[in-house]
């Protein structure tokens, strides 16, 4: 199998709009009209189609579109031992909309043995093993995202304290569980792992930080950086000391639900921790709107780390002006050399099964557009 790792000059973030056939099958399964075996058969067939489409469009680091998931993150959390699926007091609050209220909660000691996502990866691996120059890339949510979910509401904290008398024990088991899953994925052939992370997208938002100031008289920047160091520590404990030929990239998100968002603010507020200290190979970064700030913070990207510029929105079907995108790439190259820059959508097209507000053909038009620009620039 190809070991050429992402990112590539033209790239994707990973999730794609669920096909109508897949949506119907999932709905039929939830209503008891079909069984798990039949649903899996449909998933397998639709994943093969989405992989073939990515290759047809010239994308060589393919994903399964996250077609087996309802959420980009929760399905993975539910796959751990010691984690239950319950309903939160309310869904995540996005700009003008509230999501479904599913969540994950501690029910016992957390561990990562026999995680179902390993089989999800091996199916994808086998689809491309004979396709020269194509790699199977796999996406999972960040360890810090898992931690944040487990302390989301008072009832989450009450549940975890029954198992973990202190948060250090919780963090240790999160790290060990992730290490187990990553090791299992690697042993099955994975060479490129993408870590999706909305925690940074929360920390850049002053409104998020303000919710904690109400409970404390400390300065908001002190609170922000305390969170940043905690999230950084959890992530880096997982990202470090892995096999040398395993590439770990991360995607930073400000929310992507039905074409809406939850966070706003530039990267400068957490650039020292995120860009200076997080131990990853590349960053997939949102830069499609003013909510993401300017490029100056990219000067903090340490070492020879790469930056994938998410300049093309996945939230609506409108194609940006090519000249504007090329000019923005040139502007970003003032802070990170052009040979370490790449281009992608700002996020996936369907971080949850609802998907964003565009059609499949409009989704593909976005990918054609990205490749066209990348071919011209690089």
Question: Which stretches of residues belong to each language-model region?
Answer:
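Domain-level signal for soluble alpha/beta catalytic cores
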Residues: 1-378
């Amino acid at each position: 199998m190809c070991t050429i790792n992402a990112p590539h000059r033209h790239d994707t973030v990973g999730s794609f709009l669920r096909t109508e056939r897949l949506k119907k099958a999932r709905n039929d399964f939830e209503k008891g009209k079909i069984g798990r075996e039949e649903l899996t058969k449909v998933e397998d067939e639709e994943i093969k189609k989405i992989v073939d489409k990515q290759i047809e469009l010239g994308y060589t680091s393919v994903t399964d579109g996250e077609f087996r998931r309802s959420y980009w993150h929760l399905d993975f959390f539910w796959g751990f031992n010691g984690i239950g699926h319950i309903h939160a007091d309310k869904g995540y609050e996005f700009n003008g909309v509230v999501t479904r209220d599913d969540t994950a909660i501690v029910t016992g000691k957390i561990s990562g043995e026999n995680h179902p996502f390993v089989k999800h990866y091996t199916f994808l691996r086998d689809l491309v093993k004979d396709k020269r120059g194509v790699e199977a890339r796999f996406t999972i949510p960040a360890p810090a995202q898992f931690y944040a979910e487990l302390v989301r509401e008072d009832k989450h904290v009450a549940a975890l304290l029954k198992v973990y008398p202190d948060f250090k024990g919780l963090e240790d088991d999160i790290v060990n569980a992730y290490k187990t899953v990553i090791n299992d994925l690697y042993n099955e052939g994975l060479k490129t792992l993408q870590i999706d992370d909305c925690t940074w997208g929360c920390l850049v938002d002053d409104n998020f930080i303000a919710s904690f100031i109400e409970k404390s008289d400390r300065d908001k920047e002190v609170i922000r950086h305390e969170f940043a160091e905690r999230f950084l520590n959890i992530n880096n404990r997982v990202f470090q000391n892995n096999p040398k030929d395993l590439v770990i990239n991360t995607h930073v998100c400000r929310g992507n639900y039905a074409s809406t968002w939850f966070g706003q603010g530039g990267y400068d507020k957490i650039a020292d921790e995120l860009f200076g200290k997080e131990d990853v190979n590349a960053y997939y970064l949102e830069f499609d709107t003013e909510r993401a700030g300017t490029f100056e913070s990219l000067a903090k990207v340490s070492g020879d780390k790469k930056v994938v510029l998410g300049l093309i929105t996945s939230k609506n079907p409108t194609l940006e002006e090519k000249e504007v995108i090329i000019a923005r790439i040139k502007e970003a190259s003032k802070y990170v050399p052009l040979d370490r820059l790449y281009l992608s959508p700002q996020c996936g097209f369907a971080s949850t099964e609802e998907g964003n507000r565009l059609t499949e053909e409009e989704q593909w038009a976005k990918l054609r557009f990205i490749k066209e620009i990348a071919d011209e620039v690089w």
